[in-house]
A protein has these predicted regions:
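Conserved ABC ATPase "signature" region
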Residues: 135, 142-160, 212
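Conserved signature/switch motifs of ABC ATPase nucleotide-binding domains
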Residues: 163-166, 184
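Short coil-to-helix segment of the ABC ATPase nucleotide-binding domain corresponding to the Q-loop/switch region
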Residues: 124-131
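The feature captures the beta-strand-to-loop junction immediately N-terminal to the Walker
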Residues: 70-72
Length: 288
């Protein structure tokens, strides 16, 4: 329950994706850095000795960007996101979220967190699952109802509010989880492989839905994935990470236009970026 109330972020969709990362249709305000990570390292102490999870991470995320973390298993993608979310503490370096410490940003509910599994309570209806963080935050019944209806509409689940999680497909459950994360209108969304367990057709559909949601809400998004096509399709910026210890190998701008039908994955521009990401992943392994 505490996790559900923790956080959520902002998203956008404008002219070219490169343009969007500088000016997401909101002028100079979008140039604001909302996540600022400087020289961050994290070492876990274990019975077998220290494990260097992250090393010398430097990253700035602008308001309205959609930033994907991609890399092999164990490279620290989720760990880095958890540091931003105040779920892990760095050993050294600094992190600010909206100019605050991660702890203060969490307490201010600056971001919503979407997990790999939908993490819906099976004994609560979809409506009641989405309502949970709002109840904790003290919203009135009328306000809760308005927000539930609004966010169910955003994720195309209107009419499913009285259903239980077990009555929904896996993809619908994840959409309900996203609606819950958006319910208190956070500045940002942190999404940890939310579609990783879904089949390819459902995943494609949810990728399209997420882009539309991003365009509608203009929230900053941090998205963890293992999928190169998914990262290129969704992102304005892709952070390629290498393992042992986790570090940033390369940051790649996605200079694609605002309209991204699934067919864009066959375009020369898309394939060129995908190839660059793949090469970055390969070289990151070689250099380790």
């Amino acid at each position: 329950m505490a996790i559900v109330q923790l956080r959520e972020p902002r998203m956008n969709l404008n002219d070219s994706m490169a343009t969007r990362s500088r000016d997401n249709g909101r002028g100079e305000a979008n140039a604001q850095t909302v996540i600022d990570i400087k020289d961050l390292s994290l070492v876990f102490e274990t019975n077998d000795g220290p494990v260097h999870a992250l090393s010398n991470i430097d990253l700035a995320v602008k308001r309205g960007e959609f930033v994907s973390f991609i890399g092999p298993s164990g490279c620290g993608k989720t760990t880095l996101m958890r540091v931003v979310a105040d779920l892990e503490q760095p050993t050294s370096g600094s992190v600010t979220v909206n100019g605050k410490t991660p702890e203060q940003a969490r307490l201010d509910r600056s971001y919503g967190y979407v997990f790999q599994a939908a993490a819906l309570f099976p004994w609560r209806t979809i409506e009641d699952n989405i309502s949970l963080p709002l109840e904790i935050m003290g919203f009135s019944k009328t306000e809760r109802r308005e927000r539930i209806e609004k966010n169910l509409a955003l994720v195309n689940l209107s009419g499913f509010d009285k259903k239980y999680p077990w009555q929904l497909s896996g993809g619908m459950q994840q959409r309900a989880s996203i609606a819950r994360a958006l319910s208190f209108d956070p500045d940002m969304l942190l999404m940890d492989e939310p579609f990783g367990a879904l089949d390819e057709i459902v995943r494609d559909h949810l990728n399209e839905q997420l882009l539309k949601l991003w365009a509608a809400t203009r929230k900053t998004v941090i998205f963890v994935t293992h999928s190169i096509p998914e990262a290129v399709f969704l992102s304005t910026k892709i952070v390629v990470m290498s393992p042992r210890p986790g570090r940033i190998h390369e940051i790649i701008d996605c200079d694609l236009g605002p309209d991204r039908p699934l067919e864009i994955r066959e375009s020369e521009a898309f394939l060129k970026i995908a190839h660059r990401v793949r090469e970055g992943l390969r070289l990151g392994h070689i250099h380790e």
